[in-house]
Amino acid sequence: MTFRVATNDDIPGLNGLVNSAYRGEGSKQGWTTEADLLDGIRTSEDSLREMIERLDAVIVLAEQDNEMKGCVYLEKQADALYLGMLTVRPNLQGKGLGTQLLHAAEERAKEIGCQKIRMTVITVREELIAYYKRKGYKDTGERKPFPNDPKFGIPKRELEFLVMEKEIR
């Protein structure tokens, strides 16, 4: 597995990868699907382009045999590195790639001088929260509303985020 920073040339493949892992029937092959919580798409080519072109952010791609297997969005914020859109192909979930992507995020945090990583997780995703806790992330107690914007998906029920953090040494 190799890791690199995504470019605009990767946008079509990234769009397919992320949406297949989070939404729709294909996402149900993995354990991280949001298909029962949200309709619509997880991201779009325009959103990915905005992420890639930000000066304070990167999308790290995991590839094997020239095929995208996973990715993670990392954005430097005032006091932390924000981690989002952690994605692993549904048929590869549970095989350690998510852990490798988290490790890549921690290395990036160290490189740019961030002492913690912050993320948001939908509160009803108990299995995902438990996964992140096993990886050293803690519930900060902070909650945020789920955005009322179809570009993030259309909630099938009331949703909110919890904020999790991990200290990086």
Regions found by a protein language model. Give the residues of each.
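Conserved beta-strand in the GNAT
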Residues: 61, 67-75, 82-87
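C-terminal "cap" of GNAT-fold acetyltransferases
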Residues: 49, 115-118, 122-129, 135-169
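A short, internal acetyl-CoA/4′-phosphopantetheine-binding micro-motif in the GNAT/acyltransferase core
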Residues: 61, 86-93, 121-122
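Conserved GNAT-fold acetyl-CoA-binding loop/helix
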Residues: 19-48
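A short helix-loop-beta-strand connector motif used in the catalytic cores of GNAT acetyltransferases and
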Residues: 43-60, 82, 157
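A short beta-loop-alpha structural element at the N-terminal edge
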Residues: 2-16, 24
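Conserved acetyl-CoA-binding loop-helix of GNAT-fold acetyltransferases
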Residues: 88, 94-107, 134
